[in-house]
């Protein structure tokens, strides 16, 4: 999930296009995604693809093509800010529209790993700066002046001494004939006037008044609806079905078997096709299906936990090792050992899964909410055996993605049914489908050990992760990848350290979930660091600072959160505070959770967070993302879980899969660290630290350790 800080194998464009009086700028992607010398269109070698990212027309209209979907993370506001800053225009002058799904032109368009801002920050600045310099050069040529004698402001080029002015619209025809600068001068952060300022999201209004289009809203002429009955036991196979009563339901057109692929496993179902979703659902309820579930009904949460504990005895794959842990642990004066458990979790997106697909002859069209436009396009082309250029993907706003919408399985179902029916088909999952079918966040067992020497110093730490591997669900590899250990701070200055993982293979489907493995591992590691601090008779925050002397950014957020939370002040009666830290998507966060005893239960009073995400494009967006992810972290910490009994998910809807309620939401204070480091991802960083900070706060208040989630605030 974690993308590189720079866009791989991509050259910054130096291309301009002329289409009437239009200046277009973008990047070039070379054939095979190889780095090469960037050519202008007239001299471009075969395989060079030109893609306009911005267009400025003769009316001065500036259009930015956003090649990554908006799913609530705020890119529709932040991305134009980056361009406007370097282009020397006000934010209001930049219109943003979705770019078509086209890997050849736009590279990866997948929205994962909090990658949108950090992946586009420098390229968009370069595009804006290049356009600005070209427009200034065009004006200078017109006035027979040096470019240095001119400057740009609010979409106008001005001559410094004469005061002559020319709007961008007047200059685009001349500017489009110029060669773009190879290294346009970028503003220094101290000179930013747009980046770093708070501005309201431009999609707020349409989302509030109902104008914004989500996948589930899409309608096209001649469309039909589909509701699919799937086995409650994962990997169950359809033996037979009786659709007699289903076909008697008014509006039902057809009943068909279908399937989808989930991380290499085929999931079968029976689809009811109807003229309305209501009719499809009613027809589905009347279906009689015989399933072959094999021996899969033996699985339960209890068995899974037992298997995990047995697996913990294995050494596993070693991902990182410093010093000699075994020797240091054996010779430690104080030994600390603890295990931590986290359950499966559903994404439970506000907008249930859905997809609209129309297949005809050698052509396919998709409409829907997706984090992965390229993946949908590739999937449908492969599935239908048609050229990828014959697949058109229309991606909409998303009612939440959280990793679930990076998958293409729902589109696969819709395409299969559309091909069979010869009509556009919209597949809609019910809330029960969404919660019971997954894929889920992986459950995990974390086994931790630490040694404290005779001087009270932490001399050794070992952390072993036991869980499924998202990328290895078909049994192809015997060992888990190191990514399953994400979220474990390896920067603590402990001389003897070992990080390892043991792969567990189950048929229960898992996938990316907000913050992925950070959401489980951080709970274990930061809870354990707290236990180690208490065993060493040291303050938990102070111990972290002492172990992070050489880590500037983690030290900064810890010091800031200690100040903002009044960490070292005496606690009020019947309250407790806990602290935790994490690095996620390049951002660093320290969090303090404060709890209080209210009658017989515990209440979360306040969350205080300090965030270092590098250069802050829009502080409102960063704060909102931190608040939202913190609340989702609270839900996972003490409200929700997916449990398995007899091979089936026990939770069905929000009556059993509990979500945090508005009245349960605590005060949240977020402080942003001013920085000139490159901007990093913030969509997930606020989630992992909530559970450990909460558990540590409960320990300070009650003296009871929480080592299994979800915890109960009523039974502490």
Tell where the protein language model's regions lie, with residue ranges.
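Cofactor-binding beta-sheet edge motifs in enzyme active sites
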Residues: 2-26, 35-716
